């Protein structure tokens, strides 16, 4: 079994300086206590498609020991008007930081189910990025051990504040 931390114990952020930029210091951001996905129908979006992460998740011991590729696609819902008007990264969400945070989170933690990995990732993003109103995460497992040829197995979840 891996010596990786469980999500409940995760409070430390690791990574490059790039991965720390843009988190929680967005001057124009206002956290919204609760929204629904109906509220986000016309919201602005940051889209990250096909982020590849090598991590150790799975029900079978071999998956945890050897690791495998996961492919993450994200939609972050936020008000990006100020970023567009002022051409300022400080008024937006740094997608480079988001990518590094997702990569670090999935490498740092071990889950049996990709449903749990997606849920933990969604909650981490909502905590670290106060201007994110909601998130859609698609987490694919292209090397899923099902014994048949397939392109990928995965889950897609949506979470809001």
Label for each model-derived stretch:
Residues 2-161:
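N-terminal, polar/charged subdomain of small-to-medium soluble alpha/beta proteins
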